[in-house]
Regions:
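Cyclophilin-like peptidyl-prolyl cis-trans isomerases
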Residues: 21-289
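Bacterial N-terminal signal peptides that target proteins for export
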Residues: 1-7
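Bacterial N-terminal signal peptides
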Residues: 7-17
């Protein structure tokens, strides 16, 4: 079942080496108003929970069918009052099962896996690293890895492969053993877990409320099953909420000078251990009523 498929990815113990002292670099200048972009209300998922509010930016460029399914189920109230039935500390929090056991799903047909996407020259993408034969960066707020641009000329559709990276806050779709068995259950990452890359569909990222994701009641056992779990009380697109209740989010634009300064600061702080998961894109949130 869904819970068993994802259960195979058990988080290993994290080992950290000694931290070398570095001279503190001056903080970057504050961002200008033009350094921010507004998230469209039609791409902002508002997840109210028993522990607080989580806001997720949807990424239809990466997984259009999965984003459409999330929007449909949210609009129908399917997710309201469902449990965070499987939560593993230092890994992820899973929900979206009407049975609360890991075995349930919606009445809609299963989805074909969207583990990778095609990136063309017209897709907004901000690279932050260029390991050999690849580019790593962001599509919207979602960290991704893609093939380099110079390969586009040699492909039939003038595009290259890309895939989402499972950094903290990334939203993924749970599934059974088969690749094309995702339906309604999803999970939000509490920490980074690269073993999921290209194995589970990425459809968005938490832009506000990662602290809430990490505060959800976790299981004391390795299977992650939670007794008396926290719940989602209401899940809607911001666009479907009354104007007075609608939160708004301004994200730092990844094409801005302020973002480049943020990346440089993270790279300097981490040195050889730098990862795209070390970059937290700032957000300005107006909560709504």
């Amino acid at each position: 079942m869904v819970r068993n498929a994802l259960a195979a990815a058990v988080l290993s113990a994290l080992l950290s080496g000694p931290v070398l002292a570095q001279e503190a670099s001056p903080p970057p200048p504050p961002p200008a108003p033009t350094d921010w972009r507004a998230i469209s209300p039609s791409d902002l998922l508002v997840i109210d929970t028993s522990k607080g509010r989580i806001l997720v930016e949807l990424a239809p460029e990466l997984a259009p069918a999965h984003v459409e399914r999330i929007k449909l189920l949210a609009a129908r109230g399917f997710y309201d009052n469902l449990a965070w039935h499987r939560v593993i500390d230092w890994f992820m929090a899973q929900t979206g099962d009407p049975l609360g056991t890991g075995d349930g799903q919606s009445w809609y047909p299963d989805l074909k896996g969207e583990f990778t996407f095609r990136r063309g020259p017209d897709m907004a993408f901000t690279p932050v690293a260029a390991p050999t034969g690849a580019l790593i960066g962001f599509v919207r707020s979602v960290p991704v890895q893609t093939q380099p641009d110079d390969l586009m000329a040699g492909t039939g559709d003038k595009k290259v492969h890309g895939w989402g990276l499972y950094c903290p806050g990334v939203a993924g779709m749970a599934r059974d053993e088969g690749n094309d068995t995702a339906n309604s259950q999803f999970f939000l990452m509490r920490q980074a877990y690269p073993a999921l890359d290209k194995r589970y569909t990425v459809w968005g990222r938490v832009v506000s409320g990662l602290d809430v994701v990490r505060a959800l009641k976790a299981s004391p056992t390795p299977d992650g099953i939670v007794t008396e779990p926290d719940r989602m009380t209401r899940v809607r697109l911001a666009a479907d909420l009354p104007q007075a209740e609608r939160p708004t989010v301004q994200m730092m634009n990844t094409t801005s000078a302020a973002f480049r300064a943020l990346v440089d600061q993270a790279r300097q702080a981490k040195g050889a251990d730098f990862s795209v998961c070390d970059i937290d894109i700032p957000a300005q949130v107006t909560p709504g009523a």
